[in-house]
C-alpha cells in the first residue's frame, strides 16, 4: 500500500507541475482559448491512450507503474475542473460561441488523441 501511495503522489505532483508550466507558457498566446489547459488535456488524452494499451499488453509490470502513470501523472496533468471554469466563464459573459468552441476543442481533441495514442501503442508494441 505504501508504494502505491508514493507512486500516485509522485506521479500527480509531476503531472500537475507539467500542467502549470504549460499554462504559464501558453495561456497568454490566445486568452479566448487558454492553450495551457487545452494542451494539457490533449497531451493527457494521447498519453493515456498509449498507457492503457501498454499496461494491457505488459501484464508483468508492477501495479505501481500503472498507478504512477494513469492515476497519478495523468490525473495531475489533465483537468476537467479548469476546463469547466473556462467554458462557463465564456458562457456567463455571453460568449456562447467561444464557450462552445472551447468545449468542442477539448472533447473532440481529447477523444481523437486518446484513440491516436492507443493506435500508436498498438503499432509500437505489435510483434515484429
Curated annotation (Swiss-Prot):
- What protein name applies here? Fluoride-specific ion channel FluC
Q: Which residues bind Na(+)?
A: 75, 78
Q: How is its activity regulated?
A: Na(+) is not transported, but it plays an essential structural role and its presence is essential for fluoride channel function.
Q: What does this protein do?
A: Fluoride-specific ion channel. Important for reducing fluoride concentration in the cell, thus reducing its toxicity.
Gene symbol here is fluC
User: Catalytic activity, per the record?
Assistant: fluoride(in) = fluoride(out)
Q: Indicate where this protein resides in the cell.
A: Cell inner membrane
State the InterPro entries in the record: FluC
Biological process, per Gene Ontology:
cellular detoxification of fluoride
